[in-house]
């Protein structure tokens, strides 16, 4: 079973993603440095959870961006 993140962590990740979309990568360590730079979190555990969910959220959003384009290509190939 996977981790379940609180609403606060999800909200913070969405705000970070919206503001700094160009800096975020699919690498956990890079995202951890972004969290350290832009979010004032004193707890190491919470900071790591934010960085981990940010990495996962980035991958999900990246898939959503590429999915509609792939579907259009498949439809045009079938016709």
Swiss-Prot record:
Transmembrane segments: none annotated. One of its GO terms (cellular component) is ribosome. It comes from the Archaea. GO terms for molecular function: structural constituent of ribosome. Pfam families: Ribosomal_S17e. InterPro entries: Ribosomal_eS17 (IPR001210), Ribosomal_eS17_CS (IPR018273), Ribosomal_eS17_sf (IPR036401). Keywords: Ribonucleoprotein, Ribosomal protein. One of its GO terms (biological process) is translation. PANTHER family: 40S RIBOSOMAL PROTEIN S17 (PTHR10732:SF0). Belongs to the eukaryotic ribosomal protein eS17 family. This is Small ribosomal subunit protein eS17. It comes from Saccharolobus solfataricus (strain ATCC 35092 / DSM 1617 / JCM 11322 / P2) (Sulfolobus solfataricus).
